[in-house]
């Protein structure tokens, strides 16, 4: 199958040009002008549009069981929503397994979840929920099997202590894997939460007050120092929500430490005032939404290159689940927001169309750097001969208002309801096949492929 995309502006992280793009058998074969492919071929007119590499979202939680609830998006509805929003690859953070389980236990479970449902290509981050010799010995074997990143938690049920973190950092570094971490100070959060609950303060706003930015920033600083102690182990901070943590990361980067960081659209565009609305439970996630001052600091990091990746942390619990389980108590509410369908459009509208970032920087944040950090480059995150034919076409002339009834996830609400975006996703191709066009999804469950990722190689800092 041949596809010729004509008359668009093709954008990669290192530049853009008005040129045509030829995809054959799912692979980019040629870029340039006056391309004359062999018949037959499909021609797509991208006049006036940007032609970007398909998005790579390296932080989703599909089909996750958090003990009190299971998220309402599985690998079909989640990847369907992703591709309708211009994302053609996801790397899912697997949930915790049973107490004492092997490291690969969850990989086997999650490959079963995704195998016959994923619409687009996918991989997983390993999850380290306890440390012993057997777990450490499994790490290099899993890297050989194509899992080159693993997640640690400093909070929740399976949080690691500093000694366990050091052991994990060392073995992951030795094995060619990247350590990712959810950084929040669990003891400080538990103390604040208990204080509020004892006083009967259980409204949504106390979720944010129980997890102040200092809890996140302290844990970021601690992880940076532990990574240095562990032999300058590479480190990736997930879902950054505040400027103080970013300051610590800037300092580490200035000292040439291999650290990288992602943020999410919710921390750039939503703020803590959402907790005081009638539907405040809709916005329970961790870290919580911050104030507008913190948003501004994150936008500075987006603009000046201090932030490397924009992902989503898509973790969908319906409003019905939230209300039934929480019964008005923030501490009982399952955490997470939907957003995998909105990431590309929101960042394009609020970033590119406002002049905060260039189209090239948009590519770097949404596909190129995620692919480089997580062992998918140059197969993903790039439009060049030999790369996969993963493409998203965005028309900057179109304006759209986000309405949940038009979205493709399995939630019953959107935190972005009513947001007006300048720029519309008009077509998404996965390996050369159009599976979203002008509002219509045409993909099929099970067409996505598991991606064996290469061992971690640090991009130049």
Curated annotation (Swiss-Prot):
It comes from Escherichia coli (strain SE11). Signal peptide: none annotated. The modification N6-carboxylysine is found at residue 151. InterPro entries: Amidohydro-rel, D_phenylhydantoinase, Hydantoinase/dihydroPyrase, Metal-dep_hydrolase_composite, Metal_Hydrolase, Metallo-dep_Hydrolases_sf. One of its GO terms (molecular function) is metal ion binding. Belongs to the metallo-dependent hydrolases superfamily. Hydantoinase/dihydropyrimidinase family. It catalyses: D-5-phenylhydantoin + H2O = N-carbamoyl-D-phenylglycine + H(+). One of its GO terms (biological process) is pyrimidine nucleobase catabolic process. GO terms for cellular component: cytosol. Its EC number is 3.5.2.-. A divalent metal cation 1 binds at residues 59, 61, 151, 313. Keywords: Hydrolase, Metal-binding. Catalyzes the stereospecific hydrolysis of the cyclic amide bond of D-hydantoin derivatives with an aromatic side chains at the 5'-position. Has no activity on dihydropyrimidines. The physiological function is unknown. This is D-phenylhydantoinase. Its cofactor is a divalent metal cation. HAMAP family: D_hydantoinase. Gene3D superfamilies: Metal-dependent hydrolases, Urease, subunit C, domain 1. The keyword Secreted does not apply. A divalent metal cation 2 binds at residues 151, 182, 239. Carboxylation allows a single lysine to coordinate two divalent metal cations.
